[in-house]
């Protein structure tokens, strides 16, 4: 079960060192190194090759819904889905399923169906996604979720602030979270495919309380979000730092504890100084960093949407230029180099 630790006091702000900022940080700073990838064993490589072969089949069809399945709902892979089916995607699912081949293939297939049904299978609204920036914009008017900076291992940071909740509980809140997860993935540098969550449960008096609504989500919503994160974003969470946790939030965490898989629990850090995990020049000054960040929705939101779209455009153009095939590496797709660092086996690849 979760253990509660006494919160350490963070150093006060030094106004002389603060950096005023109101938009996302576009690129990973040169001072942060990306950890090296652990090489695959011979057996792991064989399993990877089998997964690649399966999803490279030109006759492959996938359901358009995670739960409601019929033969009429089987559709071939679209170009954007092939761009999602990367080398690192296969490895994430293989690790999450403990290298059980059938489980891995089934999980990826299920996620493809879920992404179609949820409305995010086209890698951005410019390609046809139903979850758009305009749809969820109202959810972020209070700045309850913010993508800002990178932590020590080059993971982009997504701040979650339940205390800035500004809307009633609805499916749109889940859509908003998924939208932000997709956007923080856009910000990942070449060589890093996981993210960091910084979750602050502090209450913010400047955000009016929504009548009849708790700032701690209902258990049903919590379970749905956990299902999405653990099933459809496996191995994406690198670290989750939680702070200012009130008793109500502890109660919520205890209630959802049985639904959190052991690997996810290991990545949760409670009430430790954020500066232990994030460089000060990448961290909000509220948590001991040097970034004097103030959320202005009219400034931040358009900048986030535009920057993320630029990154997706870069990714997709490189996907097409490298052959538009399943199994390309995110290192190559997010990078700027001209030649493939991770070429796909020609006998397995297909357009």
Curated annotation (Swiss-Prot):
- The protein here is known as Phosphatidylinositol transfer protein PDR16
One Pfam family of this chain = CRAL_TRIO_N
Q: Where does this polypeptide localize?
A: Lipid droplet; Microsome membrane; Endoplasmic reticulum membrane
GO CC terms in record: cell periphery; cytoplasm; cytosol; endoplasmic reticulum membrane; lipid droplet; nucleus-vacuole junction; phosphatidylinositol transporter complex; plasma membrane
> What reaction(s) does this enzyme catalyze?
a 1,2-diacyl-sn-glycero-3-phospho-(1D-myo-inositol)(in) = a 1,2-diacyl-sn-glycero-3-phospho-(1D-myo-inositol)(out)
> What are the alphabetically sorted keywords of the record?
Endoplasmic reticulum, Lipid droplet, Lipid transport, Membrane, Microsome, Transport
User: Which CDD domains does this entry report, sorted A to Z?
Assistant: SEC14
Provide the GO MF annotations for this entry: identical protein binding; phosphatidylinositol transfer activity; sterol binding
More about this protein: Present with 15361 molecules/cell in log phase SD medium.
Annotated GO biological process: negative regulation of sexual sporulation resulting in formation of a cellular spore; phospholipid biosynthetic process; phospholipid transport; response to xenobiotic stimulus; sterol biosynthetic process
So what does this one do? Has phosphatidylinositol transfer activity. Involved in the regulation of the phospholipid composition of plasma- and endomembranes. Altering plasma membrane composition may provide a possible mechanism for multidrug resistance. Involved in the regulation of sterol biosynthesis. Contributes to efficient phospholipase D1 activation in the regulation of phospholipid turnover. Regulates the release of fatty acids from lipid droplets.
The protein's organism comes out as: Saccharomyces cerevisiae (strain ATCC 204508 / S288c)
> What coarse category fits the chief subcellular location reported for this protein?
other
SUPFAM superfamilies linked:
CRAL/TRIO domain, CRAL/TRIO N-terminal domain
Q: How does it assemble?
A: Homodimer. Apo-SFH3 forms a dimer through the hydrophobic interaction of gating helices. Binding of phosphatidylinositol leads to dissociation of the dimer into monomers in a reversible manner.
Residues in CRAL-TRIO domain copies:
135-295
